[in-house]
């Protein structure tokens, strides 16, 4: 697996933010504002921690996916791309 799925998801998120289609969860949370999206990131972080402590791998994977999705939405609202994060991670690796 590569970064491809993250990049594809980010592009879908950008499209949903731009077009705000009815029935889109992304559009729904973005319409509530950046503070709401940031709170969702916090909630998903806690849920990820709880799933980890419960030692339930399937639940943990699901919560990590939710956290990544909400982080990508917040990143889009901040104008930060996955490439920005990849570069920062690469910089830290050195």
UniProtKB/Swiss-Prot annotation:
Transmembrane segments: none annotated. Keywords: Amino-acid biosynthesis, ATP-binding, Cytoplasm, Histidine biosynthesis, Hydrolase, Nucleotide-binding. It is found in: Cytoplasm. Its EC number is 3.6.1.31. Disulfide bonds: none annotated. It catalyses: 1-(5-phospho-beta-D-ribosyl)-ATP + H2O = 1-(5-phospho-beta-D-ribosyl)-5'-AMP + diphosphate + H(+). Pathway: Amino-acid biosynthesis; L-histidine biosynthesis; L-histidine from 5-phospho-alpha-D-ribose 1-diphosphate: step 2/9. InterPro entries: HisE (IPR008179), PRib-ATP_PPHydrolase-like (IPR021130). One of its GO terms (cellular component) is cytoplasm. One of its GO terms (biological process) is L-histidine biosynthetic process. Pfam families: PRA-PH (PF01503). One of its GO terms (molecular function) is ATP binding. SUPFAM superfamilies: all-alpha NTP pyrophosphatases. Belongs to the PRA-PH family. This is Phosphoribosyl-ATP pyrophosphatase. It comes from Saccharolobus islandicus (strain L.S.2.15 / Lassen #1).
